[in-house]
Amino acid sequence: MKAVHFGAGNIGRGFIGLQLVKSGYDVCFIDVNAEVVEALKTRGAYTVGYAAEEAAVEEVSRVTALNSQTEAERVVEAIATADVVTTAVGPTLLARIAPLLAEGLKQRTTTQNVFVIACENMIEGSSHLQQEVMHYLESTPGNVFFPNAAVDRIVPLQHHEDPLYVEVEPFFEWVIETKALPDDYPVFEGVTYVADITPFIERKLFTVNTGHAIASYLGALFGKETIAESLQDVRVRRGVQSALYETGWLLLEKYGFDPKDHSAYIQKNIKRFENPRIHDEIVRVARSPIRKLGPRDRLVKPARELMDRGIEANGLALGIAAALTYSDPNYSEYSELNTFIEQNGIQETVATYLGLEADERLSQLIVSQYEQMHPMSDSIA
C-alpha cells in the first residue's frame, strides 16, 4: 500500500507519517526542504523520540521523499498511484499544494478508491482542501474521497544534529469521519472512526487549541518563554482554566459530552501543556494570530457562541485581549496586526480581524480587557 504525505516537518514525520508506516503503508513525503528530502531519500528511515519519563525511541522505515519544487512530475506520478494522500502543511498552504494534487488525481488510471485527508488544525480541513482542488478539476472523480479529520499531538519546535530526528509527546489523537465513505475506507493504527466528526473537532479545537493559545498569549504577557513555564504561573493557569471551563460548558450544551469525562479531558490536556520534557516555545504556539483570532477559529467562535447563549465569556475575552497585545517582529502577521492597532485603534481592529461590531457585548469585553492590560500587564494580576 502506498501513501503520499505532504509535509515532511515535525508533525509529518512524528505523527501522520509514523502512523501510516505502522499501518503498513510505504510513505512518500512531499516537501520543499531539500536537506530533509535528500536525507529521507538516502536513508529511507528516521527516528522518533518520545518526551516521557521513560524515554523511548522508535525507528521508522519504508519511507522516501520528493521535492515538490524540483520534482513536480514525480510528485504527480506518486499521487496517481497512491492509495492514500495526507497533508500536514498548515491551513494556509493547502491552496498551494492543490494544483499538484489535482494533477495527480487527473492522471489516475485505476478505478481503485483514493482517500485524501487533510490533517490540519482547522474545522473541515479535507472539505477545504477539496474546494481548493476543485479549482483545477471539472468535477471530483467518483473514486476520490475527502474525509474530514481531527488531529492532536504536541510537537514543539526543535533542533537536532540529525535533520530527521523528531521528538514528540506520547499522547496523540487522530479521528476520521466515515460519513459518505465507501466500505473499503482505510483503517489506520490508533485512529478513531466516527460517523460525525464535528463534536470531536470542536472538542479538540475549543480545548487543546484554545487552551494552548491562551497559555501562550498570557504567558508572553508575563514574560514566560515556554508553555510549561507559563502554566507554573498561577495567573496564566487561572486564565487557561477559566477559558476551558467556559468552552467546556459550551461543548456540553452543544454535544452532550459527559461532564465528568470532559472535566477529565480538560485536566489531561493541562497536564500535557505542563510536561517539562516538552520545550514548547511560546513563539511557536503564538504563530498565525490573524487566523487564530478569526471569527471561526479557537478563540472568537466559542466566545461568540457562549455570548449568544447568555453566558459571559470573560476567560476567553481575557485570552483574546492578551493575543492582541502580543508582538513578534519575526512574523509579518504580527507586524500587520500591531500596525493596524496603532493606526486604527483596538475597536476597529476587533471589528476588522475578529468580525465583532462595537455594540456587541463580546467586543466590549475584549476591548475593556485590552485597555486594562495594555501597556501595563500588572493591571490584570
Curated annotation (Swiss-Prot):
Biological-process GO terms, alphabetical: mannitol catabolic process
Enzyme class, first EC level, given as a word: oxidoreductase
UniProt xrefs under InterPro entries: 6-PGluconate_DH-like_C_sf, 6PGD_dom2, Mannitol_1_phos_5_DH, Mannitol_DH, Mannitol_DH_C, Mannitol_DH_CS, Mannitol_DH_N, NAD(P)-bd_dom_sf
GO cellular component: cytosol
Binding of NAD(+), residues: 3-14
Key words, A-Z: NAD, Oxidoreductase
Substrates-to-products reaction catalysed: D-mannitol 1-phosphate + NAD(+) = beta-D-fructose 6-phosphate + NADH + H(+)
One Pfam family per UniProt: Mannitol_dh
EC number: 1.1.1.17
Membership in a protein family: Belongs to the mannitol dehydrogenase family.
Name under which the protein is recorded: Mannitol-1-phosphate 5-dehydrogenase
Source species taxonomy: Bacteria, Bacillati, Bacillota, Bacilli, Bacillales
